[in-house]
Amino acid sequence: MKMQMKNSRLVVTGMGAVTPIGIGVDAYWNNLVQGVCGVDAITRFDTENLPVKIAAEVKDFDPLAFMPKKLTREMDVFMQYGYAAAMEAIDMAGGDDIASPERMGITVGTALGGIAPIGETQDGISTGLHKKVSPRFVPKIIGNEAAAQVAIQKGYRGPSLTVSTACSSGGDAISTACMMLLSGQADAVLAMGTESALSPLFILGLSSAH
């Protein structure tokens, strides 16, 4: 399949943001231009026995503002961030009238997927706190679930791809979306980058490589 690159124009019609310096595009941009710093003391878990006490943590995020309670139980935090940002972008771009479901694609970039549930579950098993693993465990750690949940909830049936290329995952998801459009595979593509790697396991892993 040949890409018709010459004279092709791709247009960004919507954006969404869930970040350490703001939830929502307006809040994020206003804080960005004002020089607000998102790095602060970690509050998600106890850091007493960890070598690192600070991180760029997303705070004041309420998933119920973006999805029903039942859906929050199906998603790890990285999926919730992506889903919330996706809903904002979709709404900004025109809602359900963006493209037909069959021609609506999704690309997601995530380096680690659900790394936090892996550490939490292993700790629970090792300490005897958990006698069995939740049936939601595997779906919560799979990187592609971020794209899948959006597609399921919105009824999109176009191409759905997940890119995992370390720190460039989000950028590569955008370039993959561009190629998807230029090749004619889709009329519109939701390009996402999402991560929630903040966990004791990840902190210890990075610290040991310092």
Question: Language model features by range: what are they?
Answer:
Residues M1-G158, M179-L182, L198, L204, ...:
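Conserved "HGTGT" condensation-loop signature of ketosynthase/thiolase-family condensing enzymes
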Residues P159-T165:
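Short loop-beta-helix segment that forms the pyridoxal 5′-phosphate
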Residues G170:
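Short conserved active-site loop signatures built around small residues
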Residues A173:
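Active-site histidine-anchored catalytic micro-motif
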Residues T176:
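Internal active-site segments that recognize and position negatively charged phosphoryl groups
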Residues E195:
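Catalytic metal-binding/acid-base residues of hydrolase active sites
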